[in-house]
A protein has these predicted regions:
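Alpha-helical segment of the N-proximal tetratricopeptide repeat
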Residues: 63-92, 96, 136-159, 163-169, ...
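Short coil turns that delineate tetratricopeptide repeat
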Residues: 64-65, 98, 129-132, 165-166, ...
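Conserved structural position within tetratricopeptide repeats
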Residues: 92-95, 126-129, 161-162, 193-197, ...
Length: 505
């Protein structure tokens, strides 16, 4: 299981950096974006060159040895993706030392409660007045990412890595962060560096396997997970990760077996129990899938996990053709998300309801509500808000283009373009490309549409439109390759299923 990038339990799309920026951040590469964007491992032009420390590790500033012990225990739990347990350790550390900047920073980084994250960010900023320069850079990296200010975040990350080039944990964090931005090759380079420094770094073994899986190199990923299981033989997460990657590779029976092995190690391991539901759903056994989701729900510790499980439960009805029941279930989950004031989930559920709407008018109404939810007061980060708004606008452009409402589609594309210029977030940039590709296709500009759609490779709807245009252009080889890729998509979101089922018939 991955904490930042979950192949199955992820209805909020990944946050990416613009392609040019991603290319520019590879270590020791020449800057490709602009003079304002340093290459990863180089310093920001606006900052003094950071001193290179001979110490391998970033210091941990705290007045309490007990707080430091708890913080480090939390780190190790987090490397094995036991996020709830890690957060509990970090919260306890802040009680021992209320001015523990790194503990507050990690709560910001991995917290699931938006209100807690907002409070932790404020505490971290106050506590950072008395910490080392490296710790201040770590905080800046995290806070700027959380606010959706990616260029500033990269600059801070660059400077921090330049200060501590032999810190395996920072290389690991950089790799995981790049993975969350969709730069899997760059992520793999940093994760491999962490493993060169510490060959038994369990979290890095797991993360590298996911890097490879995201590049569809499943056979190369599996040995790292087997090594991970050797390093952590009593932990369920290595088996859970192996099950998830086998699922993504379409090896569903093997995936079921590995989820069961994980549950033997920890019968209360929520992610593996939910994973069983996902695989049975992919196998077409929706009754059994719902039974497994029902078992998983009481195991969920965080409200977001409960909502994830309930959403998957609802989607199972759509998979068996009972769209009315799926809508009813999603409406029920929406009530719960609203009660918990989880605006990102409210927005996503409206997106799902738009996909299942009885009419285009109803679909657009749900997209209106998805946008309106994001404007409501909440503790949602700027990054999360931009991600959800970008997805809503892309869906609006796609549906409007299909309906021939080119004015509405153009307005959505224009809005996305303004967001790209303001945020430099790649989730926005890719959504803009996908939306513009749909609009250009509707305007009978297939060549331009093809180039745009290629820039949105993780969106199933964009890839389906790409395959259609490639076929119409008599580009049989490319069309076949795109269709094969879609057919091999074993993602578990509603959109994955709605699109991919057409390519498996």
């Amino acid at each position: 299981m991955q904490i930042l990038l979950r192949l199955r339990r992820h209805h909020c799309r990944r946050a990416f950096l613009p392609r040019a920026v991603v290319a520019a951040v590879l270590l020791y590469s020449a800057p490709l974006y602009s003079a304002a964007m340093p290459a990863l491992g180089q310093t920001s032009p606006s900052s003094a060159s950071p001193a290179i420390h001979t110490d391998d590790r970033l210091p941990i500033t705290t007045s309490s040895p007990e707080a430091q012990r708890l913080f480090e225990e939390g780190l190790h739990l987090r490397y094995d993706y036991h996020t709830d347990a890690a957060l509990a350790k970090w919260r306890e550390a802040t009680m021992k030392d209320p001015n523990f900047a790194q503990a507050w920073t990690y709560i910001v980084w991995f917290g699931l409660n938006p209100a807690e994250v907002r409070m932790a960010a404020e505490k971290a900023q106050i506590a950072s007045r008395n910490v080392t320069p490296g710790e201040k850079l770590l905080l800046k990296w995290v806070l700027q990412t959380n606010d959706g200010r990616f260029l500033s975040a990269i600059a801070a990350m660059n400077d921090l890595l330049a200060m501590y080039p032999r810190d395996a944990h920072l290389s690991y964090e950089a790799g995981l962060w790049l993975q969350s931005q969709g730069d899997y090759e760059g992520a793999a380079k940093f994760t491999k560096r962490a493993l060169e420094i510490d060959t038994n770094f369990a979290g890095a073994l797991n993360t590298l396997a996911y890097d490879l899986a995201f590049m569809h190199q499943y056979d190369a990923a599996i040995p790292y997970l087997k090594r991970y299981a050797e390093v952590e033989p009593t932990d369920p997460n290595p088996r859970d990760s192996l099950a998830e990657i086998l699922q993504q590779a379409g090896r569903l029976d093997e995936s079921l077996a590995e989820y069961r092995e994980a549950l033997k190690l920890d019968p209360r391991f929520y992610h593996s129990q939910e994973g069983l539901g996902d695989v049975y759903s992919l196998l077409g056994n929706q009754d059994r899938a719902r039974q497994e989701y029902a078992k998983a729900l009481p195991m969920a510790q965080a409200p977001t996990e409960k909502l994830d499980c309930q959403i998957q439960f609802a989607i199972s009805y759509a998979r068996e053709g009972n769209v009315k029941q799926a809508r009813a279930q999603l409406e029920s989950v929406l009530v719960q998300a609203t009660k918990w004031k989880l605006n990102a989930y409210q927005s996503s559920i409206h997106q799902y309801l738009a996909l299942l709407a009885e009419s285009r008018a109803a679909a657009f109404e749900h997209l209106d509500q998805s946008e309106a939810t994001l404007k409501m007061p909440s503790h949602m980060s700027g990054k999360a808000r931009d991600r959800q708004l970008a997805r809503t606008l892309e869906m609006r452009a796609q549906l409007a283009a299909e309906a021939g409402n080119l004015a509405m589609a153009q307005a959505a594309v224009d809005h996305l373009q303004r967001m790209v210029q303001a945020s430099r977030s790649n989730v926005v940039e890719r959504a803009w490309h996908g939306a513009n590709g749909a609009l250009l296709a509707a305007q009978a500009k297939p060549s331009a549409a093809l180039e745009e759609l290629k820039q949105d490779p993780d969106n199933a709807s964009s890839m389906a439109k790409l395959a259609e245009l490639q076929g119409a252009a008599a580009n049989a080889l490319d069309a076949a390759e795109t269709r094969t890729r879609l057919k091999a998509d074993y993602g578990t979101t509603l959109e994955d299923w709605l699109v991919v089922r057409e390519f498996r018939q």
